[in-house]
């Protein structure tokens, strides 16, 4: 590993339909084995279902709100002090918030049995928009864990 400098962040161009960078990142997370066109079809049809089900005029704003509802604010990180390992609550960086929310939404959409990815993704986005479902439960569990370990907050980095 080179010690000179860290790699530069590359700018991601917006997606072709909505021009949104966040949606393009979401498509990249859905993509498997480099098949971006398949991922785009899945995401766009899921967004279409999502918009129709909730009667949204601007689907992108609805997607943003669903993503915002899924973002964690606090998480716990392991910190070794002496011989003991403590779960220390830490505020989540904004880039990581987006990343975790997207990962959780996609993970729970894939785990829905008997449904195609498009239907599962649309259902999970609707649930996030309405502040319910597996992704929101995961977020609440993460917050609950951080709250339970608040006593170790002074072990921050």
Swiss-Prot record:
Coiled coil: none annotated. GO terms for cellular component: small ribosomal subunit. It holds the Pfam family Ribosomal_S7. The keyword Manganese does not apply. The keyword Aminoacyl-tRNA synthetase does not apply. Gene3D superfamilies: Ribosomal protein S7 domain. Belongs to the universal ribosomal protein uS7 family. One of the primary rRNA binding proteins, it binds directly to 16S rRNA where it nucleates assembly of the head domain of the 30S subunit. Is located at the subunit interface close to the decoding center, probably blocks exit of the E-site tRNA. HAMAP family: Ribosomal_uS7_B (MF_00480_B). Part of the 30S ribosomal subunit. Contacts proteins S9 and S11. This is Small ribosomal subunit protein uS7. It comes from Chlamydia pneumoniae.
């Amino acid at each position: 590993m080179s010690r000179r400098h860290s790699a530069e962040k590359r700018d991601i161009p917006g997606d072709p339909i909505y021009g949104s960078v966040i949606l393009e990142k979401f498509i990249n997370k859905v993509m498997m084995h480099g098949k971006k066109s398949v991922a785009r079809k899945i995401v766009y049809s899921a967004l279409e279902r999502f918009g129709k089900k909730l009667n949204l005029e601007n689907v992108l704003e609805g997607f943003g709100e669903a993503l915002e509802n899924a973002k964690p604010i606090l998480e716990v990180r392991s910190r070794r002090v002496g011989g003991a390992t403590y779960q220390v609550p830490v505020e989540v960086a904004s880039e990581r918030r987006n990343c975790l929310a997207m990962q959780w939404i996609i993970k729970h959409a894939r785990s829905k049995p008997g449904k195609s990815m498009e239907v599962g993704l649309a259902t999970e986005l609707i649930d996030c928009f309405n502040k319910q479902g597996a992704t929101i439960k995961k977020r609440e569990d993460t917050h609950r864990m951080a709250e339970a370990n608040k006593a170790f907050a002074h072990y921050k980095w």
